[in-house]
UniProtKB/Swiss-Prot annotation:
Expression induction or repression: Expressed in the early phase of the viral replicative cycle.
UniProt keyword list: Early protein
Protein name: Protein MGF 360-15R
Similarity remark: Belongs to the asfivirus MGF 360 family.
Functional description taken from the UniProt entry: Plays a role in virus cell tropism, and may be required for efficient virus replication in macrophages.
Length: 276
C-alpha cells in the first residue's frame, strides 16, 4: 500500500512538472515517511530566505506559519504574510517546542539566528549552537539531501557534513560536499584513516583527486591503519620511512615495525626488477 501511494504521488508531482526528480523524491519522503517533518522544511527554507521553495511548500499545503518562527527581517515577514501566514501565538510556540521530532532543530535555528531562547545552564550559546548544528547535519546526511544543501553555508559546516558522509559511506553526499569544501582531501583522509574505512579511503585516493599518496600514508600511520598503508604501497606510495617515523611518534610501535618490513620488501622488489 505504501509503495502504491509512493508511486502515485511521484508520478502526480513529476507529471505536473512542479519539481525535479530529486526534489520529488525528497518531498514524497517528507509526506509518506515523515523522515523530515514538513514544518522543518518550511523553517529551513525561511531561514535561508529561499522564497521559491517556501512558495512550493505552501502550494503543497505545508503551513507557512512555521516560517514566522525563524525570520525577523521585514522582507521575509512580508513574504510570509503575502502567503496568508498568521503570526504564531505563544501557545503554538510552546506546542512546537514540546514536539520531540524536531525540537533540537528548532532550537538550533533560533540560537543560530540570534533569537533569544532558554539556554542550558553553564553551556555557552556558541557551544550549544555547534552541537545542535552537528545534530541536524548528521540527520540530514542520512535522510534528506535537498534539505542538507539548504542548511550548509560555511566551510566548517561542509567539513562536518563531509566527515559524516565519509564515516558512513554516504557517497552522493560525500561527492557533493567534496566539491564545496576547500579542505576536502585532508578531512577525508583523517576520517577514513581514523575509522580504517577502506571504502572511503578508496574513494579519496582513486576518485577524489588525491594524488599525494605520501600524505595518505602518513595520515594512516597516525591512526595505526596498517591495511591502508599496504593499500598505498600497492598504488605506488613509497614514503614508508616517513610513515614509520610518524607511527613511532604517535606510539604505534607495531605499525612502525610494519612499515620497516614493507620498506625491506619494496627495496627487494625494486632490486629484483633492476636485475631482470
Amino acid at each position: 500500500m505504501v509503495l502504491v501511494e509512493f508511486l502515485t504521488g511521484f508520478f502526480y508531482l513529476y507529471g505536473k512538472r512542479l519539481f525535479s526528480i530529486s526534489k520529488v523524491m525528497d518531498m514524497i519522503c517528507l509526506d509518506y515517511y515523515t523522515i523530515i517533518p514538513a514544518p522543518l522544511a518550511m523553517m529551513l527554507a525561511a531561514r535561508l530566505k529561499n522564497y521559491d521553495l517556501m512558495k512550493r511548500l505552501h502550494e503543497w499545503e505545508i503551513s507557512v506559519d512555521y516560517a514566522l518562527l525563524v525570520v525577523d527581517d521585514v522582507p521575509s515577514i512580508d513574504f510570509c504574510l503575502s502567503l496568508g501566514a498568521k503570526s504564531p501565538t505563544r501557545a503554538q510556540k510552546r506546542e512546537l517546542l514540546r514536539d520531540n521530532t524536531f525540537n533540537p532543530v528548532y532550537k538550533y535555528l533560533m540560537n543560530c539566528s540570534g533569537f533569544p531562547t532558554k539556554r542550558e545552564k553553564n553551556i555557552p550559546c556558541d557551544v550549544q549552537c555547534e552541537r545542535l548544528q552537528k545534530n541536524i547535519i548528521k540527520e540530514l546526511v542520512f535522510n534528506c539531501s535537498v534539505l542538507l544543501e539548504m542548511v550548509l553555508h560555511t566551510e566548517r559546516e561542509y567539513a562536518y557534513a563531509l566527515h559524516c558522509a565519509a564515516k558512513h559511506n554516504q557517497l552522493p553526499i560525500l561527492m557533493y560536499c567534496w566539491q564545496q569544501s576547500t579542505d576536502a582531501e585532508s578531512i577525508l583522509l583523517k576520517t577514513c584513516c581514523s575509522d580504517k574505512n577502506i571504502n572511503c579511503f578508496n574513494y579519496c585516493i582513486l576518485y577524489g583527486g588525491a594524488q599525494n599518496l605520501d600524505a595518505a600514508m602518513v595520515e594512516a600511520a597516525k591512526h595505526d591503519a596498517r591495511m591502508l598503508i599496504n593499500y598505498c604501497v600497492m598504488l605506488g606510495g613509497r614514503s614508508l620511512n616517513q610513515a614509520k617515523e610518524t607511527a613511532a611518534m604517535f606510539g604505534h610501535i607495531e605499525c612502525a615495525q610494519h612499515c620497516f618490513k614493507l620498506q625491506s620488501y619494496v627495496m627487494d622488489t625494486l632490486n629484483v626488477d633492476d636485475t631482470d
